């Protein structure tokens, strides 16, 4: 049994070798010749999986180690009788922590408290729901927009997108990319929406590049609209609008979900799905794969305020480490993908063991996803 895996899927060689012969290949572009005798293909979001790639090939199963699936033609796979699995929620925590790292940086730079801001979350799935929970744990007001969930009758205080635009100081997008249909998200943030944002608002896109109309956004910024922008995703990736990059406050190369934990979850989820598909079901404990974190434990004295939280968050991950390299190589062919391929190891907040002498600080840090314990000062 021959299994092709994206060369940038961590732990893929070791795990899938339990099931067959493993060959690691680049994801963009996939070497088509390798598909001629392969039984399974494991990809990431950079690989377009459709009829033109797989027609006439012996592939029986496709797995994507990503939460999003807009790069996969699921309808064609089903029609062709090819098994499929994604990894829903695998990188949700990573994306939430990317958003926090960005917001805390902007708050420090511009001198505002997040408690004084209302955050509008567009798309309340694995990422949006976790983001809501962590923001509300800090006492930050959130507004939610998710029309598909409203139509399904899901519980929640959902608002219209117009309401979020009118009332939110921060608008962050966490939707799939739907190019048509009743829940179309292509250019959901169009020129009209962008112009309608509150003066001084923050716009964040960490889902799919085309959810925000990049041309319209650049037009508004060039005209002097007072707006802070965080973009992790771009229309036309791996190409991007270099002029737009110069105008945004934070620009990164589609790495919001790139924690070691998130990548490992993606790999293990598709591994488990494929093992079940071939009748040799196996389960993997994530902590058996992950290395020891860089920082073993730290001690926090006193209560948790925003500056302290910012220092803790940036101790684990400071978004600026990914902004500067992209600006340095933007526009050079191949460099966008190279930044992703050679991405420095990044951990999640749970990797940081925090000993607190303040019980409320320990409790709050646990709600935020840190590994925190309370030890009273002696």
UniProtKB/Swiss-Prot annotation:
<dbReference type="InterPro" id="IPR029753">
    <property type="entry name" value="D-isomer_DH_CS"/>
</dbReference>
<feature type="active site">
    <location>
        <position position="237"/>
    </location>
</feature>
<dbReference type="InterPro" id="IPR038251">
    <property type="entry name" value="PdxB_dimer_sf"/>
</dbReference>
<feature type="binding site">
    <location>
        <position position="257"/>
    </location>
    <ligand>
        <name>NAD(+)</name>
    </ligand>
</feature>
<dbReference type="InterPro" id="IPR020921">
    <property type="entry name" value="Erythronate-4-P_DHase"/>
</dbReference>
<protein>
    <recommendedName>
        <fullName>Erythronate-4-phosphate dehydrogenase</fullName>
        <ecNumber>1.1.1.290</ecNumber>
    </recommendedName>
</protein>
<feature type="binding site">
    <location>
        <position position="45"/>
    </location>
    <ligand>
        <name>substrate</name>
    </ligand>
</feature>
<dbReference type="InterPro" id="IPR029752">
    <property type="entry name" value="D-isomer_DH_CS1"/>
</dbReference>
<dbReference type="Pfam" id="PF00389">
    <property type="entry name" value="2-Hacid_dh"/>
</dbReference>
<dbReference type="GO" id="GO:0033711">
    <property type="term" value="F:4-phosphoerythronate dehydrogenase activity"/>
</dbReference>
<dbReference type="InterPro" id="IPR006140">
    <property type="entry name" value="D-isomer_DH_NAD-bd"/>
</dbReference>
<comment type="subunit">
    <text>Homodimer.</text>
</comment>
<dbReference type="GO" id="GO:0008615">
    <property type="term" value="P:pyridoxine biosynthetic process"/>
</dbReference>
<dbReference type="GO" id="GO:0036001">
    <property type="term" value="P:'de novo' pyridoxal 5'-phosphate biosynthetic process"/>
</dbReference>
<dbReference type="Pfam" id="PF02826">
    <property type="entry name" value="2-Hacid_dh_C"/>
</dbReference>
<comment type="function">
    <text>Catalyzes the oxidation of erythronate-4-phosphate to 3-hydroxy-2-oxo-4-phosphonooxybutanoate.</text>
</comment>
<keyword id="KW-0963">Cytoplasm</keyword>
<feature type="binding site">
    <location>
        <position position="258"/>
    </location>
    <ligand>
        <name>substrate</name>
    </ligand>
</feature>
<keyword id="KW-0664">Pyridoxine biosynthesis</keyword>
<feature type="active site" description="Proton donor">
    <location>
        <position position="254"/>
    </location>
</feature>
<dbReference type="InterPro" id="IPR006139">
    <property type="entry name" value="D-isomer_2_OHA_DH_cat_dom"/>
</dbReference>
<keyword id="KW-0520">NAD</keyword>
<dbReference type="Pfam" id="PF11890">
    <property type="entry name" value="DUF3410"/>
</dbReference>
<comment type="pathway">
    <text>Cofactor biosynthesis; pyridoxine 5'-phosphate biosynthesis; pyridoxine 5'-phosphate from D-erythrose 4-phosphate: step 2/5.</text>
</comment>
<feature type="binding site">
    <location>
        <position position="146"/>
    </location>
    <ligand>
        <name>NAD(+)</name>
    </ligand>
</feature>
<comment type="similarity">
    <text>Belongs to the D-isomer specific 2-hydroxyacid dehydrogenase family. PdxB subfamily.</text>
</comment>
<feature type="binding site">
    <location>
        <position position="175"/>
    </location>
    <ligand>
        <name>NAD(+)</name>
    </ligand>
</feature>
<keyword id="KW-0560">Oxidoreductase</keyword>
<feature type="binding site">
    <location>
        <position position="232"/>
    </location>
    <ligand>
        <name>NAD(+)</name>
    </ligand>
</feature>
<dbReference type="GO" id="GO:0046983">
    <property type="term" value="F:protein dimerization activity"/>
</dbReference>
<feature type="binding site">
    <location>
        <position position="66"/>
    </location>
    <ligand>
        <name>substrate</name>
    </ligand>
</feature>
<dbReference type="InterPro" id="IPR036291">
    <property type="entry name" value="NAD(P)-bd_dom_sf"/>
</dbReference>
<dbReference type="InterPro" id="IPR024531">
    <property type="entry name" value="Erythronate-4-P_DHase_dimer"/>
</dbReference>
<feature type="active site">
    <location>
        <position position="208"/>
    </location>
</feature>
<dbReference type="GO" id="GO:0051287">
    <property type="term" value="F:NAD binding"/>
</dbReference>
<dbReference type="GO" id="GO:0005829">
    <property type="term" value="C:cytosol"/>
</dbReference>
């Amino acid at each position: 049994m021959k299994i092709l895996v994206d060369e940038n899927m961590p732990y893929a060689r070791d795990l899938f070798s339990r099931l067959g012969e493993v060959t690691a290949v680049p994801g963009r572009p996939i070497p088509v010749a390798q598909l001629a005798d392969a039984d399974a293909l494991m990809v990431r979001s950079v690989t377009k999986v459709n009829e033109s790639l797989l027609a006439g090939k012996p592939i029986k199963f496709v797995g994507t180690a990503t939460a999003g699936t807009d790069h996969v033609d699921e309808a064609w796979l089903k029609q062709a009788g090819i098994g499929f699995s994604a990894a829903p929620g695998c990188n949700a925590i990573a994306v939430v922590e990317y958003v926090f790292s960005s917001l805390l940086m902007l708050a420090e730079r511009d001198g505002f408290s997040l408690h004084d801001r209302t955050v509008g979350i567009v798309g309340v799935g694995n990422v949006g729901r976790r983001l809501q929970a962590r923001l509300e744990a800090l006492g930050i007001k959130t507004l939610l927009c998710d029309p598909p969930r409203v139509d399904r009758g899901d519980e929640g205080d959902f608002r219209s997108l117009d309401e979020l635009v009118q009332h939110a100081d921060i608008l962050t997008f966490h939707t799939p990319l739907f190019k048509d249909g009743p829940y179309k998200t292509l250019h959901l943030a169009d020129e009209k929406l962008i112009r309608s944002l509150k003066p001084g608002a923050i716009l964040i896109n960490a889902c799919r590049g085309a959810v925000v109309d990049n041309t319209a956004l650049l037009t508004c910024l060039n005209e002097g609209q007072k707006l802070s922008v965080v973009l992790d995703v771009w229309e036309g990736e791996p190409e991007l609008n270099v002029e737009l990059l110069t105008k945004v406050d934070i620009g990164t190369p589609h790495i919001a979900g790139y924690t070691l934990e998130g990548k490992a979850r993606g790999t293990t989820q598709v591994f488990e799905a494929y093992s079940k598909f071939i009748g040799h079901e196996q389960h993997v404990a994530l902590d058996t794969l992950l290395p020891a974190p860089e920082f073993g434990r730290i001690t926090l004295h006193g209560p948790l305020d925003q500056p302290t939280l910012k220092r803790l968050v940036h101790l684990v991950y400071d978004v600026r480490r990914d902004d500067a390299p992209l600006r340095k190589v933007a526009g050079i062919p191949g460099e966008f993908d190279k930044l992703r391929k050679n991405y420095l190891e990044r951990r999640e907040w749970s990797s940081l063991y925090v000993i607190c002498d303040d019980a409320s600080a320990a409790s709050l840090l646990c709600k935020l996803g840190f590994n925190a314990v309370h030890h009273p000062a002696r």
